[in-house]
Amino acid sequence: MRRAPATTPRAVRLALALALFAGLAAPGARAAEPAAGAGAAEATAGRDPGRDLGRETLAADDGWAAAEGGTTGGAAADEAHVFTVRSRGELVRALDAGGDTPKIIRIAGTIDANTDDRGRPLDCSDYATDGYDLTAYLAAYDPRTWGGAKPSGPQEEARRASAARQAERVEIAVGSNTTLVGLGENAVLTGASLRVDGADNVIVRNLHLRDAYDCFPVWQPNQGGLSDWKTAYDNLWLRGATHVWIDHVTVSDRGHPDDREPTLFGRNYLRHDGLLDITNGSDLITVSWSRFADHDKAMLIGNSDSATGDRGRLRVTLHHNAFENVVQRAPRVRFGQVHVYNNRYVVPENAHDYRYSWGISTESAVYAENNAFTTPGHIEAADLVKSWNGSTLHQTGTLFNGYPVDLLTIHNAYNSGSERDLTADVGWTPALHGRVDSAQRADHDVARGAGAGRIR
Ligand code: CA
């Protein structure tokens, strides 16, 4: 963030500071000192210097989170519940303040969740306890000697105890009637797993959410025939959450890409789970103008075929988001009525592990309009959609490398033997949404406008 130049007269800087504090514009001061005015504008995030993102609410027609009362987050907070936080400790204290009283929490600079109460950084060795050691863990549960049973015994117990110590630092709960917003263009929360668990009316905007890194992945042999490393943390997990608006966030593994992790027991030693997972009866969610990047499993909506309590819930709108260099789940859906419009998908030239974008699973009802995909030559339109126990997909206006395609027809023509044909009738038509642009227009606008630091 640019700062007011040192030559700015003290009185002008003071006037600006007071104006910002009061949430008022100070046109005289800015006219006298344009450079300082630009700095002040960025301090409130956005080009309009009078704009206070914390006080903004979701527009009346903007997706599922606008239904049934809408989403206001902490916009109604009194002055005692407006916080600017710069450390994990300050963030957690602000989130805890006043129970469900509306609150606005502004994140300034970079906050690392992997820090102790005095703000000192913690690494994986600081959490390890009871003799946990990766080399010993690998020796204990090597499938060639341990076999296919779930890990148990001293090393697994030590892993669990160590993982609990990390969870205590990085799992951060966000309660009802909260707005969490980044100040300026470079507000970062790294290492955290934000959890909106059983809460209602939450807004998260203008934030970089990075690297929810699991120090202690667990080996899970033979899960449905496939053994794999399982990791604990999503950057953002909505669990039984209602009325949530996620807007202009950038979520990624930045700092620790999984493709640089070793292969252990024949599998990538994954460190990250989802970027944004929406599960356990969550409902009425809008995700807009956000960027999901450089990651394996981006977004899971519904986490189990047997979670029939999700029936009639998991209603989500995804619009004007960028999914760039993600391997799968953009999103993968069970049960929900999910409106996917005007999103931009980019698979880079060097992506050799791409799996699919839209996952159509049990009782899902995805209504997709005017989305744009850009992929390298070895990826075909038939690769974009994958179904497991899914039966419907509505899609229109899809653009694939600049050409219109009908992904439903292509899926049914080229699906593998294990997938059944999908029908176009998803049983609903979205009513709450803004203007639906052409895929070409959306692709262009999202490339320029999605993600943290880009609210205009
Ligand atoms: Ca997850």
Would you name each region that the model predicts?
Residues 1-37:
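Secretory targeting and sorting signals
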Residues 39-77:
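N-terminal low-complexity, Pro/Thr/Ser-rich intrinsically disordered segments
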Residues 61-106:
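Acidic Gly/Asp/Thr-rich repetitive segments characteristic of extracellular carbohydrate-active
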Residues 89, 110-113, 185-186, 378:
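Acidic glycine-/aspartate-rich tracts in secreted/extracellular proteins
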Residues 93-100, 115-179, 187-205, 211-222, ...:
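Extracellular beta-strand-rich solenoid/capping regions of secreted or surface-exposed proteins
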Residues 176-186, 200-213, 234, 240-257, ...:
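Right-handed parallel beta-helix
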Residues 332-456:
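Extracellular beta-rich repeat passengers
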